[in-house]
Amino acid sequence: MTSFPTTPPPAEELMATTILQATEALSPEAEASTALIAVVITVVFLTLLSVVILIFFYLYKNKGSYVTYEPADGEPGAVVLMENDSAKGREKEEYFI
């Protein structure tokens, strides 16, 4: 029987991943600063979210509507009246420089 060369088992250091390795505990000051950073990020995010929601509701309620002065289909004389009104307005325009 021929013996095949075998590879040595990997070292203990190579088998352990960073997840399985023990981590050292953070100091109370580091934990407090981490919590403070998390709170600040959360407050900023909630503020931005509320501003976006307020803008959305404002734009939704104030969609805006416009009034057109187009005559109905049965009123051909209304077009002539509108043209005369706009011509009168042009004569009285004054430009201040």
Curated annotation (Swiss-Prot):
Subcellular locations according to the entry: Cell membrane; Cytoplasmic vesicle membrane
The keyword Signal is assigned to this record: no
Primary residence: membrane
Side Cytoplasmic, residues: 58-97
Residues bearing glycans: T2, S3, T6, T7, T17, T18, T23
Entry GO terms, CC: cell junction; cytoplasmic vesicle membrane; nucleoplasm; plasma membrane
The entry's keywords: Cell membrane, Cytoplasmic vesicle, Glycoprotein, Membrane, Sialic acid, Transmembrane, Transmembrane helix
Membrane spanning residue stretches: 37-57
Disulfide-bonded cysteines: none
Residue ranges that the UniProt entry lists as topological domain Extracellular: 1-36
UniProt membrane topology term: Single-pass type III membrane protein
Modifications the protein undergoes after translation, according to the UniProt entry: O-glycosylated. The O-glycan is modified with sialic acid residues.
Keyword Nucleus: no
InterPro entries assigned to the protein according to its UniProt record, in alphabetical order: SMAGP
Protein family according to the UniProt entry: Belongs to the SMAGP family.
Free-text function comment from the UniProt entry: May play a role in epithelial cell-cell contacts. May play a role in tumor invasiveness and metastasis formation.
PANTHER family membership: SMALL CELL ADHESION GLYCOPROTEIN
Name of protein: Small cell adhesion glycoprotein
